[in-house]
């Protein structure tokens, strides 16, 4: 399998995730054998999780093996203070972030995952109630940001790797924390799978076959959905759900899942997807429901679903802008306001007026070009500003006089004895959601 990988990839530069255990040790030595016949570049990376007093000793073992074999080794340390909630997931995320930062653009990350690991992952997904995508578990090749992870041993059992390692008289680390069945993966590995294998000797390979079938069916489903989803995605990346009430629920939820898949986030649970379907499709047309997904939200506005990053409320924020300052930085990464010649023409402040920026206003407003005051909520609606953006737009005040929602509208005030000033709002918000803004 490794020879096939060497011939398949032109760059032939590999970074081995080297724990010092059986799997990664076999992987490292397999590559060394191939290096005798083919030109390849090998580096290794060892992550010390600092979970045991032996951690330092394991790092030294990895250094020794790599020094003997002239393999450049990177050693990094992880220290997690809170070792209670979801420790395995926290370590995995930190580990892969570190590895990604060390991975060269022309390198492929190789890991020693085998059939046993695949079966464990399958059972963990089963425990979570996953569908075909989750039950697909690991694939031979996975996109890793802009790079790749390849798992050459995914068809091999742990016994096969162990047999080869003993034959070659290799030395590897035995991590006895793997026997601690308080961790779900260890429980499956040590308590569940041995019983199943004892009953059915072919269980592991059939479990692996199931993951391959799930992968194939997931690819087919995604191909099917891809053709339909791009007809529903608008230019602002929102999802048009206007006709979802006339489509079967299974198709609707599949389209929602695929749309979220394109956002490159951790896939929401079945429960969350069903919640999005019920609340977004069947709530009142004038309501604006939201579902929170970690640091993001799914919101509905005018028969479209929007995926947005949750922003802290600016309701009580008040910023003072000194008249001598050309630029004012805004909170929440909203960019900055600047006095220049490319923005909105506004009435200037009087000598005794303080310039201040707020993000909340309630009441009636008379905007330029109109003859009657209207509730500001109605103006936001008219300008197609969705609710979650309304308290992110800088509102310009002179003392307590409302002057402008920068870049959206200007308030009609008496201009007597006022000079003119030009202010522009430089930010990513308008460029990514420019369909919501009408500029004067």
Curated annotation (Swiss-Prot):
InterPro entries: Lysidine-tRNA-synth_C (IPR012796), Rossmann-like_a/b/a_fold (IPR014729), TilS/TtcA_N (IPR011063), tRNA_Ile_lys_synt (IPR012094), tRNA_Ile_lys_synt_N (IPR012795), tRNA_Ile_lys_synt_subst-bd (IPR015262). Keywords: ATP-binding, Cytoplasm, Ligase, Nucleotide-binding, tRNA processing. SMART domains: TilS_C. It comes from the Bacteria. Its main location: cytoplasm. It catalyses: cytidine(34) in tRNA(Ile2) + L-lysine + ATP = lysidine(34) in tRNA(Ile2) + AMP + diphosphate + H(+). SUPFAM superfamilies: Adenine nucleotide alpha hydrolases-like, MesJ substrate recognition domain-like, PheT/TilS domain. It is an enzyme of class 6 (ligase). The keyword Ribosomal protein does not apply. It is found in: Cytoplasm. Its EC number is 6.3.4.19. The N-terminal region contains the highly conserved SGGXDS motif, predicted to be a P-loop motif involved in ATP binding. NCBIfam families: lysidine_TilS_C, lysidine_TilS_N. HAMAP family: tRNA_Ile_lys_synt. This is tRNA(Ile)-lysidine synthase. It comes from Buchnera aphidicola subsp. Acyrthosiphon pisum (strain APS) (Acyrthosiphon pisum symbiotic bacterium). The lineage of its organism: Bacteria, Pseudomonadati, Pseudomonadota, Gammaproteobacteria, Enterobacterales.
């Amino acid at each position: 399998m490794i020879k096939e990988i060497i011939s398949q990839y032109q760059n032939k530069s590999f970074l081995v995730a080297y724990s010092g255990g059986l799997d990664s040790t076999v992987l490292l030595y397999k590559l060394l054998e191939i290096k005798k016949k083919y030109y390849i570049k090998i580096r290794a990376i060892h992550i010390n999780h600092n979970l045991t007093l032996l951690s330092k000793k394991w790092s030294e073992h990895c250094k020794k093996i790599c020094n003997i074999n002239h393999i450049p080794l990177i050693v990094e340390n992880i220290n997690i203070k809170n070792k209670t909630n979801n420790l395995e997931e926290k370590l995995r995320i930190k580990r892969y972030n570190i590895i990604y930062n060390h991975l060269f653009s022309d390198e492929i990350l190789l890991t020693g995952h085998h059939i046993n690991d695949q079966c464990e992952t399958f059972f963990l997904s089963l425990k979570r109630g996953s569908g075909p995508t989750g039950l697909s578990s690991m694939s031979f090749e996975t996109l890793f940001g802009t790079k790749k992870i390849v798992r050459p041993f995914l068809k091999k059992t742990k016994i096969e790797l162990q047999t080869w390692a003993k034959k070659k008289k290799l030395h590897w680390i035995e991590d006895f924390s793997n026997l601690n069945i308080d961790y779900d993966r260890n429980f499956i590995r040590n308590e569940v799978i041995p019983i199943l294998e004892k009953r059915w000797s072919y269980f592991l390979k059939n479990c692996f076959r199931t993951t391959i079938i799930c992968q194939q069916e997931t690819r087919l489903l995604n191909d099917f959905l891809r053709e339909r989803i791009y007809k529903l995605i608008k230019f602002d990346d929102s999802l048009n759900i206007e006709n979802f009430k006339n489509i079967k629920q299974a198709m609707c939820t599949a389209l929602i899942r695929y749309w979220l898949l394109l956002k490159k986030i951790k896939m929401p649970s079945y429960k969350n997807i069903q919640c999005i379907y019920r609340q977004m499709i069947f709530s009142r047309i004038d309501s604006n429901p939201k579902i929170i997904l970690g640091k993001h939200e799914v919101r509905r506005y005018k028969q479209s679903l929007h995926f947005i990053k949750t922003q802290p409320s600016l309701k009580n924020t008040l910023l003072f802008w000194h008249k001598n300052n050309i630029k004012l930085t805004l909170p929440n990464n909203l960019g900055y306001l600047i006095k220049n010649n490319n923005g909105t023409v506004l009435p200037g402040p009087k000598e005794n007026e303080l310039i201040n920026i707020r993000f909340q206003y309630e009441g009636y407003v008379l905007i330029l070009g109109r003859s009657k005051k209207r509730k500001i909520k109605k103006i936001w609606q008219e300008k197609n500003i969705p609710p979650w953006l309304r308290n992110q737009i800088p509102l310009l005040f002179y003392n307590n006089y409302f002057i402008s929602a920068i870049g959206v509208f200007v308030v009609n005030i008496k201009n007597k004895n006022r000079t003119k000033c030009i202010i522009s709002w430089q930010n990513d918000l308008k460029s990514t959601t420019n369909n919501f803004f009408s500029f004067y």
